[in-house]
UniProtKB/Swiss-Prot annotation:
UniProt keyword terms in alphabetical order: Antimicrobial, Disulfide bond, Fungicide, Plant defense, Secreted, Signal
Location of this chain's protein in the cell: Secreted
Highest taxon in the source lineage: Eukaryota
Ranges annotated as spanning the membrane: none
Any single Gene Ontology cellular-component annotation: extracellular region
Protein's name according to its UniProt entry: Putative defensin-like protein 89
């Protein structure tokens, strides 16, 4: 009975860790099978993969989840076209 409660708690925690960053404009990409001991281990794992926002260690799930920003800069959506068109009558 205790194992089932612990498993449910871990499932809810993993779900919350994935859902909350999505609401704030971030998402997470999780990598299973990573033997992590703390968040620093996951930061070292995430940074070379262009996940500069870091990551979190889910020890019980044996995985690292890296924060991935999904909000794009407004500047990148602007047109870079600098051609001026003059219309004369």
């Amino acid at each position: 009975m205790g194992f089932k409660n612990n498993l449910s708690l871990v499932s809810v925690m993993v779900f919350a860790l994935i859902l909350l960053p999505m609401i704030s404009g971030q998402t997470m990409q999780c990598y299973s099978g990573i033997a992590c001991t703390d968040d620093g281990t996951c930061n070292d794992y995430c940074n070379p993969r262009n996940n500069n926002l870091g990551g979190v260690c889910l020890r019980r799930a044996n995985c690292c989840c890296c924060y991935v920003s999904v909000v794009k800069s407004q500047e990148s959506s602007l047109s870079k076209d600098t051609n001026n068109v003059f219309i004369t009558n």
